[in-house]
């Protein structure tokens, strides 16, 4: 009976439009923030556009696998976003990972097996050689920015930017920093900040470099 039931479930899933199912499920999910839901809906729209362009829409969950996701990655890399430019590597990786994250919600309801579809094997792409959209700052460049003589609002914005560079946190998490979460490092050497990131549920401890401490003391 178990095998008959499983076979019946598989046949039913083949008749389900995965994109519609994901969109409808997100609309009814009250466990996520409105901002997160809006972002997920936008990611589904991007994925739907890809499926339409490659002639694979509508699609069911049994046809969503790692090769398809890699095709989506290539599609994003080659899609122009303005005047001959293509989407930067980090953005491509983030878009693909968000789709996989959304699909994990479907796994919770038995619609897809992330391991069987090999989606858990996906790795974010490395920066492409000659990727003009990728912009990095060296430590020396960050130091030069911090050394600029600024006052008032410009100084505050510069300090916040440099602090984000050195602690690696998003703007909303950086804004939440206060004296109460600055602590001595467990090894007694230096200081750390302990925060619960906005999009995470666990506490993280981040070592503070001297320049970061200098900014926080202002």
Q: Could you say what each language-model-derived stretch is?
A:
Residues 43-50, 71, 75, 91, ...:
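Alpha-helical scaffold segments in carbohydrate-active enzymes
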Residues 54-58, 80-88, 116:
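Short helix/loop segment immediately N-terminal to the Walker
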Residues 86-89, 93-97, 108, 112-171, ...:
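Basic, Lys/Arg- and aromatic-enriched nucleic-acid-binding interface segment
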Residues 30, 59-62, 85, 135, ...:
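Helix-turn-helix-type domain boundary/helix-start signal
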Residues 8-16, 35-38, 51-75:
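A Lys/Arg-rich helix-loop hairpin that forms a DNA/phosphate-binding surface
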Residues 1-31:
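N-terminal helical hairpins
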Residues 120-124, 176-217:
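Conserved tyrosine-mediated DNA breakage-rejoining catalytic core shared by Y-recombinases
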Residues 36, 40-43, 91, 95-98, ...:
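Hydrophobic (often cysteine-bearing) scaffold residues that line and stabilize catalytic clefts
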């Amino acid at each position: 009976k178990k095998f008959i039931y499983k076979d019946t479930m598989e046949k039913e899933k083949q008749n389900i439009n995965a994109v519609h199912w994901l969109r409808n499920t997100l609309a009814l999910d009250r466990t996520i923030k409105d901002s997160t839901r809006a972002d997920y809906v936008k990611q589904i729209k991007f994925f739907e556009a890809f499926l339409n362009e490659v002639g694979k829409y509508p699609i069911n969950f049994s046809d969503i696998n790692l090769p398809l996701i890699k095709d989506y990655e290539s599609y994003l890399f080659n899609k122009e976003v303005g005047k001959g430019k293509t989407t930067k590597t980090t953005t491509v990786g983030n878009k693909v990972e968000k789709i996989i994250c959304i699909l994990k919600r479907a796994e919770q309801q038995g619609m897809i097996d992330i391991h069987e579809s090999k989606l858990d094997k996906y790795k974010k792409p490395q920066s492409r050689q000659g990727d003009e959209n990728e912009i990095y700052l060296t430590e020396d460049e960050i130091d030069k920015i911090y050394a600029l003589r600024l006052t008032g609002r410009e100084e505050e914005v510069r300090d916040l930017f440099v602090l984000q560079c050195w602690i690696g946190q998003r703007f909303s998490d950086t804004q939440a920093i206060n004296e109460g979460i600055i602590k001595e490092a467990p090894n007694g050497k230096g200081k750390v900040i302990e925060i619960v990131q906005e999009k995470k549920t666990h506490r993280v401890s981040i070592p503070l470099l001297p320049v970061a401490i200098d900014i926080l003391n202002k």
